[in-house]
Amino acid sequence: MTENGPDVVLVHATNNSPEDLKLLAETKTPVSLSPYTELRTGFGITPVGSFLRAGVPVSLSVDTTILCGNADMFAIMKAMSNIENGLQKSEFGISSQRVLEMATIDGACALGLADHIGSLTPGKRADLILVRTTDVNMLPFTIATNMIVQAAEPSNIEAVIVDGRFLKRDGKLTTIDMAQLARDTADTIERARKEASKEGAGKGINQLFTR
C-alpha cells in the first residue's frame, strides 16, 4: 500500500480500514469502483462516500463484461448512485453531477489523460456521445445530469464520436459488422465447448475446475 500513488489505480477496494483510506488520500492514489462486479461476486458494498469524504480520487468502471453482464456505463452510474443513497438512507446521498464526474473526467484523471479527454474542453479530443432526450424513458426531460444518471440507457445513444470520428451514427455502429461479430462469437463459443468437453471427459466438475 505504501508504494501506491497517482500512477497506480486500485480496482474495487471495497474493504478498507480508516488507515487505508488515509493512506490512499495522502498518496493521491485513485480508486476505480465497479459496483456491479463488486455486488455480483460478493466483494462487498461499494463505499464511495467513504472514499470521497476521505479525499480519495474515485472513478467508475465496468471491470469486465463476464462479471457485470455488459459494458453499460449508464447502469454503472445508476447502481453507484442508488447504492450510496441506500447507505446514506437519503435520496440525496450523492448528486448525479458527482456520479457523472466519476464516470468521465475523474476516470480521465485516474489514467493521467485529463489533459486530453474526460470533458468537453477546447483543445481536448472530440470524444462525446449524443443522447436522444425524446425517447419514452427520457420523458419528461428535466435536469440533464439526473436524467443521464437515473434514466438513460445505451439504446438512447444517437451517436458516438471518438477523437472526432463517428463510431455510431443515427443509432447504428459504423465500424462493426454486427452479423459477422455474432457469427464469430458463436464459433468461438462452440470451439470452447468442444475443448472443454475433451478436457473434462471422465472428470468430475471439481477436478475440471481445480488445478
Where are these regions (language model features)?
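Structural motif corresponding to alpha-helix initiation and N-cap regions
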Residues: 17-18, 42-45, 93, 117, ...
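Active-site microenvironment of metallo-dependent hydrolases
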Residues: 104-211
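Active-site core of metal-dependent hydrolases
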Residues: 1-70
